[in-house]
């Protein structure tokens, strides 16, 4: 059994307890993890007894409220230098973001001169775990046939956008131009003229005009899924370098909703690789194989135009087992743990390779 010590937030400005719960979801049989989120308690531990020592530098975007403070920056460097001298390796903790977001964003610190670090980004495991952790004990009443009484959907698509990104704006404008959204529920909250849900379909505890830029994206309510046939999932990125899965895909999976995804190249393939099923037996999912971003948008728009004409009652009947499988897989602790393990293995391999190279 190898022992690992993790200081889960060097400056205690982020959400160290959230990180610790994520780490606790691992199932690596030969690894023990001990944590503290408090730098000033390190003297209570026999640090020489550990095989590995990590320190997380939290780079949550809300930390910009303190990161510009020169005193914060000075103290961070002091702590990092001291921890480094004691054999700690550093994890730049940005699991809420993708690699692309980190490269293009203004996140502090980008790196620390002379210190090798590991960039922890969201990938597949973070938001799966976060949504699992948040909603495991919640009771939802999603239904797509009014609990066996009859099949009726008021609207076609559920299509939720918040922050404008180039690929999102392109798809949104083309869907509008082609009339695809004529009978759909859709939003684009951060446009100059925001497009919002009505109160009927918004989170019941939030006024549509008061929906905040941060804090509620991982919440979910039943009505918009009950009233629509298919989610158009507008993911954060559309690159071909990595797959970043956010709450945007886990919500329709929790709701047992049919989905089309505008996201990274081979996004659906990655979903299948980690145990989920997609809808390629019921409609064309070849858009996932298209690496040209504009052609992918064209393929998604063409598919959505077609989906407005299909018999959705038949599709929902035929996909009962598939959608239940996805729901069960999402809430399967062992399958989730396997993905968390991959994240932790990345940490462990980083430490071990750093030891060799140094």
Predicted regions and their residues:
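Pol beta-like nucleotidyltransferase catalytic core
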Residues: 1-233, 239-246, 250-358
């Amino acid at each position: 059994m190898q022992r690992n010590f993790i200081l889960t937030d060097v400056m205690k400005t982020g959400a160290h307890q959230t990180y610790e719960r994520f780490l606790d979801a691992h199932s690596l049989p030969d690894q023990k993890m001990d944590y503290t989120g408090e730098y000033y308690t390190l003297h209570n531990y026999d640090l020489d007894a550990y095989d590995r020592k990590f320190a997380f530098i939290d780079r949550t975007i809300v930390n910009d409220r303190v990161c510009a403070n020169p005193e914060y920056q000075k103290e961070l460097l002091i702590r990092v230098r001291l921890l480094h001298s004691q054999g700690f390796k550093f994890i730049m903790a940005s699991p809420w973001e993708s690699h692309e977001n980190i490269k293009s964003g203004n996140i502090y610190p980008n790196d620390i001169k002379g210190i090798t670090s590991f960039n922890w980004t969201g990938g597949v495991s973070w938001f799966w775990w976060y949504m699992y952790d948040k909603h495991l004990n919640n009771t939802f009443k999603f239904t797509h046939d009014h609990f066996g009484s009859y099949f009726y959907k008021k609207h076609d698509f559920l299509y939720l956008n918040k922050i404008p990104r180039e690929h999102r704006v392109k798809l949104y404008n083309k869907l509008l131009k082609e009339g695809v959204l004529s009978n759909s529920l859709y939003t684009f909250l951060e446009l100059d003229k925001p497009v919002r849900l009505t109160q009927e379909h918004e989170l019941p505890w939030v006024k549509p005009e008061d929906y905040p830029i941060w804090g509620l994206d991982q919440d979910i309510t039943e009505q918009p899924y009950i009233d629509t046939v298919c989610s158009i999932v507008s993911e954060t990125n559309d690159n071909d370098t990595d797959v970043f899965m956010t709450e945007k895909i886990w919500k329709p999976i929790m709701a047992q909703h049919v989905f089309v995804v505008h996201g990274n190249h081979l996004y659906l393939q990655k979903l299948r690789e980690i145990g989920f099923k997609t809808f390629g037996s019921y409609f064309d999912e070849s858009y996932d194989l298209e690496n040209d971003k504009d052609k992918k948008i064209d393929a998604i728009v063409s598919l959505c135009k077609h989906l407005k004409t299909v018999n959705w009652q038949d599709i929902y009947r035929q996909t009962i087992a598939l959608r239940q499988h996805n729901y069960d897989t999402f809430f399967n602790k062992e399958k989730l743990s396997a993905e968390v393990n991959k994240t932790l293995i990345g940490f462990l391999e980083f430490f071990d390779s750093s030891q060799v190279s140094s």
